[in-house]
Amino acid sequence: DATPGIEALAELVASYDPRIRLFSGESGCPAVLEWAHALRYHEWSEYSQAKWVARRMANDWMMGIRSSIFTFVDLQYPNMQQSFGLLRTNLFKEVVYKRPSFHTVQHMVNLFRPELRSAGRLNHESNTPRRLTVAGIERQKDGTLVGAVVWQNDRIPSDNLAFEPIELWIEGLSLKDPVLIEMITGRIYALPKYHGHSGDGRMKFTGLPVWDSPVVILERSALPEGTQTRERQISGSTRDMHF
């Protein structure tokens, strides 16, 4: 986890000039096992790639860092064809299909638009042994806390598509009509009333499906204008992952 080092760098840079903004630079993830370049020797899949991209973008957004996702298409080297692309290409330099990571980036960019800003890490409690990141989402215009982005951060993203239902208490959050957004498919799910209730300055979610990729709890009114939602409730299973 490079986050502590990045935060230390941001603090150092701000001590010289707070106007300087950090940039993530060339960062990306393969979609298959690679024998060269970054993140090699690990059996990546197109789904674990999408999870990695979503986590990287969410973490950068939480810290106020501009993201650069490497790369848009698969690069062709003299000795190999890379798999880092959001678009799968062939040796004829033709686009074959859009990877799940392509849709993930679309959904992240569409949701985390300029009207919303990071509220940083939120204090939380949960009944899971997994380590979580919980970052607040607030409106730019008035600083109202309108949601949170949550993911398991203690392991390399896997290609397992199962969610873990947990109990989660988030400090300072109070939502009237929350929805749950899965950032790879972009699907928006209704959260029934028993899933979330507020009290003692925090909000509790019961049976909340989380995994090693960001899910977003958001006030319905904070969705992008024109977003169509359905009253389908998330099942917390692989059925939720089908495009």
Show which residues each predicted segment covers.
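Active-site neighborhood of glycoside hydrolase catalytic domains
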Residues: 1-24, 30, 50-57, 63
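Well-ordered, non-membrane alpha-helical segments in soluble/globular domains
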Residues: 2-9, 45-54, 101-102, 162-168
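Beta-sheet entry/capping signal
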Residues: 20-22, 66-68, 147
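Aromatic/acidic polysaccharide-binding cleft in carbohydrate-active enzymes
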Residues: 28-112, 116-131, 144
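C-terminal beta-strand-rich structural cap/linker in extracellular carbohydrate-active enzymes
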Residues: 192-243
